[in-house]
Amino acid sequence: MSALRAEQQPSRSGERQPLVAQGRWGPRRWRRTAAAAVLLVEMLERAAFFGVTSNLVLYLNSLNFNWDGEHASRATLLFLGASYLLAPVGGWLADVYLGRFLAISLSLLLYLAATGLLLTTITDDGRRSFCGEMPELPLKPACPSANCQGSWSSPYCATTLYLVLLLLALAASSVRSNLTSFGADQVMDLGRDATRRFFNWFYWSINLGAILSLLVVAFIEQNISFLQGYSIIVGLVGLAFFIFLIATPVFITKPPTGSQVSSMLNLAFQNCCPGWQWWRRPSSRNSEGAHLLPDQRSNQPGPSPQEDMANFQVLLKVLPVMVTLVPYWMVYFQMQSTYVLQGLHLHIPNIFRTNPNISLPLRSDSSNYRIPEAWLLLANVAVILILVPVKDHLIDPLLLRCKLLPSALQKMALGMFFGFTSIIVAGVLEKERLQYIAANQTVPQLIGKDLYYAAPLSIWWQIPQYLLIGISEIFASIPGLEFAYSEAPRSMQGAIMGIFFCLSGVGSLLGSGLVALLSLPGGWMYCPKDFGNINNCRMDLYFFLLAGIQAVTAVLFLWIAGRYERTRQDPDSQNSTSRVRG
């Protein structure tokens, strides 16, 4: 009864407790119900997101737009990067103006509008309305010169598609940054172990949504039509929005509490440029509290200047750890861009047998469904769906009893190693594929309505690199998320979570920029004689370059992580950190 009475008491901070918590089930049962609703919304939203990203290269490379492989791969990396890079924007709006509940609701509405616009571009009338008529690709005789251009420099409908993808990235990033913390708020009162388990199952729900998307949506997009596939995506977002609104009575919602961005910038300038008097002027909070008694000052909203300084010091310690994860994210996002491009140029088996006497143009009907290339992502997702529960219920408790449980930083280092091995395996496979291409051993295959000249290597050879990147995700991404949330002071958890997602987006954008740089004349990814394929590119060298970058930064990460662990073991540092975290 005491817990129930505590739930009924109004919060001084304006926090709204769930109305239904006064029922006979008690607050603990409703906290789990609220968390389950958040997990379901996340699963549906991720299913929609992966429905867009898994075949975005194929969609842009199709006859609807005729983008070449380099442009399509770069657009996918830019979209993935923006969907993470913009995470602090949604978090800042929630902290300062909207609150997390309203920010998530508006983000889902924007999500619904953006996916609707993307659906419109699939139809001929909608595409002509937004993009105009597609320019004709001039027919030219074969040219042996390396300067022959097979496509126009500006992709068709680029402005419209990039704008739609930007809106979609803004919505997805806002949902990601706010729904994670919003879900943790629902179980915070149940203890630290409940929060840790929530993050594990939150990540599990993400990958369950990916399974749903890859098995159903990706198959429909590749073998039936993008119109039906993207219609399902719009329906998934609409259902997520409906469930989130229906579950409103069981949610704990908190009002906006303000942002510490200005305080952090103030302290940064004080440390870098102490001579700048403007940054050293007293804040309004100091001047307002100067004449107050100590008890009255403690009730002022927002952290004190001492807490600001302590938070800034924590940020200086945590940020280098997260920055050295950026090359890992460069490797990780290849899974949804260049790995897909590589798979389109490997032999993809048919699900059903076809009559060999049927001509090639007639083999694209319903009797010749091909296994979607995006299904290779299932190897990554299946590893996570299987290993996360096993790790949570069996491996971690066993290691804990034996006192061998690695720290979050040690797990992240192990994740970097598996990411390194994944990109090495991809490079070796690409090198082998190019040997078949050099020997003029190619297999023409139709994927949807598009013709690709693939090497006679089975696409199943990509499974090891997807499995390895999936294992790396368990050891790098999940512990990284837990590290960002647990190491941050309570007043900065949202900001540091946003920085974590933002830096992962930086990794995707750096990967896109590296592809663009290597696509310049003379670069490894420069292959103007290839329209829509990569057979004259040297993507194997690109993979090996990423592996080298990952190896160097992994060594740097080990050094930074070692210093961080030694700092945490310092008694004075532990005392100051505990005071900040309350």
From Swiss-Prot:
Chain intervals for the UniProt region annotation (Disordered): 1-20
GO CC, alphabetical: endosome membrane; lysosomal membrane
Glycosylated residue positions: 178, 223, 357, 440, 575
GO molecular function, one term: proton-dependent oligopeptide secondary active transmembrane transporter activity
Membrane topology: Multi-pass membrane protein
InterPro entries for this protein: MFS_trans_sf, POT_fam, PTR2_symporter_CS
Domain of life, per lineage: Eukaryota
Reaction it catalyzes: N-acetyl-D-muramoyl-L-alanyl-D-isoglutamine(out) + n H(+)(out) = N-acetyl-D-muramoyl-L-alanyl-D-isoglutamine(in) + n H(+)(in); glycylglycylglycine(out) + n H(+)(out) = glycylglycylglycine(in) + n H(+)(in); carnosine(out) + n H(+)(out) = carnosine(in) + n H(+)(in); L-histidine(out) + n H(+)(out) = L-histidine(in) + n H(+)(in)
Summary of the tissues where the protein is detected: Abundant expression in lung, spleen and thymus, and detected faintly in brain, liver, adrenal gland and heart at protein level.
Stretches that traverse the bilayer: 33-53, 77-97, 102-122, 155-175, 201-221, 232-252, 312-332, 371-391, 409-429, 466-485, 498-518, 541-561
Keywords: Endosome, Glycoprotein, Immunity, Innate immunity, Lysosome, Membrane, Peptide transport, Protein transport, Symport, Transmembrane, Transmembrane helix, Transport
Gene3D superfamilies, A to Z: MFS general substrate transporter like domains
Membership in a protein family: Belongs to the major facilitator superfamily. Proton-dependent oligopeptide transporter (POT/PTR) (TC 2.A.17) family.
Protein name in UniProt: Solute carrier family 15 member 3
Classification lineage: Eukaryota, Metazoa, Chordata, Craniata, Vertebrata
